């Protein structure tokens, strides 16, 4: 039984890994089309990891176990051990001075939307590297297991247990069918990202920076294309775009699904209330501290 579960878990991990391998071709194609330097490492990384994932998929085809809590734990662990390694490959090839540990750290930080980085002088880093960091964080905001959730219907297995294992979203799912939830998640995430990109453009941010920052803003991650992050722009309009879309990105998917894809208002959700109260308290503390530091008073 355990061997069957491991084989099936390997199949799901390989499928997610194949998706990330295909995503590596985006920076390569962008570099090829625009003329950026540093695109080739993404071609070789995508081919290498993609070939390995295809071999695993062929070796484990036909494995469709019944989803259980134990199986969910196995998949979660497999994913978090393997996907950061795959995503670190372009860093290792494109930045030879970067250690393996640093490359894995950068990839893990992106996928977990932590936002910590070991890279500096970002403005002089290859554009494909900056784009890859944004893509990783964007997918990380969606959730690696949410990506697996979207793919699972094509493997003819259910996936809500996996979603609960990885996601902090505990709200009641407003739609009963997994495939409908998957479609809704994709549309919501793409919609938020697209509108955020347009908002950054309207605020005067350059096109590449707008796309990169939109992906990391909606993901609530924090990766930037500048060492100073959003402070580089010295513009309150840019900051307000980030504030609004980071707030929207922090709301559970179930809220947007209920709002846009059902005919009823979203049910009251304690986690949303707590989220808003936490933001208000934190904002008040920051304002008070800032006023004290600038020697102003109420």
What are these regions (language model features)?
Residues 1-298:
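Membrane-proximal intracellular helices of multi-pass ion channels
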């Amino acid at each position: 039984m355990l061997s069957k579960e491991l084989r099936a878990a390997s199949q799901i991990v390989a499928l997610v890994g194949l998706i990330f391998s295909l995503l590596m071709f985006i920076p390569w194609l962008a570099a090829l089309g625009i003329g950026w330097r540093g695109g080739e490492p993404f071609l070789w990384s995508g081919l290498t990891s993609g070939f390995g994932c295809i071999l695993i998929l062929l070796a484990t085809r036909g494995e469709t176990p019944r989803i259980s809590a134990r199986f969910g734990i196995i998949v979660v662990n497999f994913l978090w051990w393997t996907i950061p390694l795959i995503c670190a490959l372009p860093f290792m090839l494109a930045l030879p001075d970067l250690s393996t540990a640093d490359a894995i750290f950068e990839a893990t930080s992106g996928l977990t939307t932590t936002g910590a980085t070991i890279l500096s002088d970002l403005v002089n880093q290859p554009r494909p590297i900056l784009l890859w960091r944004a893509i990783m964080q964007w997918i990380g905001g969606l959730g690696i297991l949410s990506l697996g959730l979207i793919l699972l219907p094509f493997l003819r297995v259910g996936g809500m247990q996996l979603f609960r294992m990885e996601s902090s979203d505990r709200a009641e799912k407003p739609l009963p069918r997994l495939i409908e939830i998957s479609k809704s998640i994709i549309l919501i995430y793409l919609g938020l990202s697209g509108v955020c990109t347009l908002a950054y453009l309207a605020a005067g941010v350059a096109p590449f920076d707008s796309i990169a920052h939109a992906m990391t803003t909606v993901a609530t991650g924090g990766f930037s294309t500048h060492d100073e992050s959003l402070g580089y722009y010295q513009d309150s309009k840019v900051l307000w775009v980030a504030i609004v879309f980071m707030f929207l990105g922090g709301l559970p998917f179930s809220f947007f699904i209920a709002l846009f894809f059902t005919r009823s208002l979203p049910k009251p959700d304690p986690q949303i209330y707590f989220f808003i109260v936490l933001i208000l308290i934190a904002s008040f503390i920051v304002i008070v501290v800032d006023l004290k530091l600038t020697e102003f008073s109420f």
